[in-house]
Amino acid sequence: MNEMIRFPLQLTDSAINRIKTLIAEEANPHLKFRVYITGGGCSGLQYGFTFDDKVNEEDIAIEKQGVVLIVDPISLQYLLGGLVDYSEGLKGSRFFIINPNVQTTCSCGSSFSMT
């Protein structure tokens, strides 16, 4: 697909600002923020985040405030209606997803399961 669309996976301002900072530190304006789902964690599935300078043909690309978020079609089905956020606190800093589709999460919040 590899086209820019409006999609029900949102980014908070906090996530956008952190992504922009990290891309600037890498000095590569072509980087995009990839969100994906993998098997693993104590609840069966877990979120992954990485930077990627290529968009695969089947990827969905979502642009917001100059940040391009990319998601593969398999991961996308688990992320519908989700919100990508970023927080900094005493326990460290991290990207995370608020996902309305999740049935259960592990205590650390990095893995989840769905029905």
UniProtKB/Swiss-Prot annotation:
Per UniProt, subunit arrangement is: Homodimer.
Gene Ontology CC: cytosol
**Physiological role:** Required for insertion of 4Fe-4S clusters for at least IspG.
What keywords appear on the UniProt entry? Answer: Iron, Iron-sulfur, Metal-binding
GO biological process assignments: iron-sulfur cluster assembly
Q: Which NCBIfam families does its entry note?
A: iron-sulfur cluster assembly accessory protein, PRK13623.1
Q: Which family does it belong to?
A: Belongs to the HesB/IscA family.
Could you tell me what the cofactor note in this record states? Binds 1 iron-sulfur cluster per subunit.
Q: Where are the membrane-spanning stretches?
A: none
- InterPro entries in UniProt: FeS_biogenesis (IPR000361), FeS_cluster_insertion (IPR016092), FeS_cluster_insertion_CS (IPR017870), FeS_cluster_insertion_RrpA (IPR023063), HesB-like_dom_sf (IPR035903)
Disulphide bonds annotated for this chain are none
Name of the protein: Iron-sulfur cluster insertion protein ErpA
Where does this protein hold iron-sulfur cluster? C42, C106, C108
- Provide any one GO MF term from the record: 4 iron, 4 sulfur cluster binding
Keyword Metal-binding in the entry? The reply is yes
- Reported cofactor(s): iron-sulfur cluster
